[in-house]
């Protein structure tokens, strides 16, 4: 009992410090002219660029990740794992019901948008037995995905004018350290979509 006042005093000083640290593990932000959408607790959240309270956009029990605003900022494409499958979904930027765009049993991971409003994603759907990823695009309305002109890509995005693709050709087995120059360094390749060079 003689230590009880000490622990009460310690707790009284530690509690405000814990609250002052704020929310942690906000991940994968995508930024528009007015808003920021990010992943927290496996859901998508949206907040004004000026700050304020964040609003939850998705509430499904699944895992949402990799949000990307469309170029007109009216839609958000994201990857979600609902009912055990990882696919591409879109949702209005103001919130609403997610719409599923891909149906392949392999994982489909959103990378961005084309200037024409198609969603770009990576998948290993055509690469058996090596599991090499390729980039695909799918219409905003849905339909069959179409492979992009590069043979393999683990991560990448199309330039805003649609003329170039910047990508990393292979996945890494371990996250890299900043300024790392060893054999696991991931080169970024840039390809002109017209000349294929």
Residues covered by each model-derived region:
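Short, ordered coil/turn segments that flank beta-strands lining enzyme active or ligand-binding pockets
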Residues: 49-52, 71-72, 93-94, 115, ...
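A flexible loop/linker signature enriched in serine peptidases of the S9 family
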Residues: 20-21, 39-45, 60-64, 77-89, ...
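Bacterial N-terminal signal peptides
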Residues: 5-14
